[in-house]
Every structure is written in structure tokens, then in C-alpha cells.
Amino acid sequence: MGRDTERAISAPAQQTSMKLLIDKAIGLGAADAVPISPGKVVVGNWVRLKCQFGCGGWGRCLTCPPYSLTPEQTSKILSEYKKALLVHSRGSHPSLRKLMSELERFAFLKGYYKAFALSCGPCNLCD
């Protein structure tokens, strides 16, 4: 809590303006949101090690390793998108998960049918 965190929400190339999504993200409580190219996202293999050896939650949540996507799967999925929105928040994981879930739904309803929020940390939305 209190630590800066960043998340990405991917969306397909559509006519809908990314500005609408940026405004919505900020309206939901994000500190900032900027469009990025998914092709510029670097997916490091070392990140999984931080989860495995640095987090007591390893293997306890289906959104975390070893159940989550591998770096290879993540890279492959990102390659299928033309646009992404990097969302910056100073909030905690639970509040940010809710923000991202609402933003993903909003994007989908605006025509970004492949919209999918990606983030780190355990998800407690279904607990």
C-alpha cells in the first residue's frame, strides 16, 4: 500500500479515441494513463523468479505463478495487439484491481473487444 504501481490494459486498433479511455482511467482514480505500443513492452523472464523466491503467495492464487501466463505466453499475446494503455496508480492492489476491472469493461463496451487488463499481484475480486 502506498507504493507506485503500473498496469497495462491492452486494446485492439479501433476508431474509438484512446483519450476517452485515458479520461475514464483518471476518473476511476488512476494517477495517469498513457497510450503505448504493446511491441515496446519488455517481458523479462527474471520477473517470475521474484515471485517464486520473493513472495509468500507463490502458488496460492490463480493469477500468480505458477498458474499465470509464462513470459513467452505474455509476449505472444501482446504481439496480437496494436494499442495498449499504461495506467499509473498510487493505490493498493485491491483498489487498483477494481479500477482495472472497471476500465476493461468500459473499453469493451466502447468497442475495444479484445480489451484485457494485465497486472501484477494477487487478485481478491472473487474472494
Which residues does each predicted region cover?
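Auxiliary alpha/beta "docking" domains used to position bulky ligands
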Residues: 2-127
